[in-house]
Amino acid sequence: MEITKDIRYIGVDDHDIDLFEGQYDVSENGMAYNSYVILGEKIAVADSVDGGFVDEWLGNLEAALDGRTPDYLVIHHMEPDHSAGIAAFMERYPQAQIVASMGAFRMMVNYFGTDYPERKMVVKEGDVLDLGGHSLTFVGAPNVHWPEVLFSYEATDKVLFSADGFGKFGANDIEDPEGWACEARRYYFGIVGKFGKFVQAVLKKAADLDIQIICPLHGPVLTENLGYYLDTYNTWSSYQPEDEGITIAYASVYGHLKAAVEELASALEARGQKVSVFDLARDDMAEAVEDAFRYDRLVLASITYQGEICLLYTSDAAD
């Protein structure tokens, strides 16, 4: 897929996955592992993909190269769903250098038994990789959401490569009828939400850049109305509610607390309130967390278990 004249999408879609990171339900729409190639006088590949799709990714890369050879593999984020293809790439393209933060190279030793000492290029905040006609300026983004993370900015086409920032659940070959925000919100608060102050820090850096395109490592490439996405991330990372409404989260064994919650929800709705109710024993925990941050009020209705409150209960708990 052509993003700009010289930047191509070479990522893959995963429709076999049921739980992303072993806990987030993506069984309906799958997951995308994004990767990109920048075709300057020199060629840089931005990130790899999950281990089950390395061959497909390398095939996509070969097609985009059209007979040329890559000069660099740029690693923005070392999580295995983005770094599993490193060894195969380095073996296939023995002349290529690998570009990453020092923290990423430390992880490579643990992952692959080497940090490619003869071929590595360590970069940090403010460093520039000149590709001839294009360049990547690196932006430190620690703890968004891993400590080694870098963003990079391509100034010619005004593209931000944002690692897991601005990511979204869902494969890219499926159109999400709910739009970007719903699954991007669930993704953000499940995976990145703990690190709001670090997201705020990188957003301040991004404010100084003329960004026309955002290329994340999950979800669609963002090309229009970028102010909306940046403003939304500012809201999420500053822990401000998006909407007026009430999230009620509960766990009930024998149904007594459930009945009380249903009565409360009905009474609130009768007063014109927007109410979102989650049974934490049965409903998707990530969706409950999503709505807890989305709305401006939260009710936690708890059973008791051995004299303590218990929202997540064991099988012999009683309310």
What are these regions (language model features)?
Residues 2-65, 151-154, 158-162, 257:
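Conserved beta-strand hairpin/beta-sheet module of binuclear metal-dependent hydrolase folds
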Residues 46-48, 71-78, 99-101, 160-163, ...:
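Active-site neighborhood of phospho(di)ester-bond hydrolases with catalytic His/Asp-centered motifs
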Residues 313-319:
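Conserved small/polar residues in nucleotide/adenosyl-binding loops
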Residues 2-5, 50, 100-216, 220-224:
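Metallo-beta-lactamase
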Residues 79-81, 105, 280-286:
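Short acidic loop-to-helix transition motifs that present clustered carboxylates
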Residues 225-312:
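N-terminal beta1-alpha1-beta2 submodule of the flavodoxin-like/Rossmannoid cofactor-binding fold
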Residues 41, 52-99:
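Active-site metal-binding motif and surrounding structural segment of the metallo-beta-lactamase
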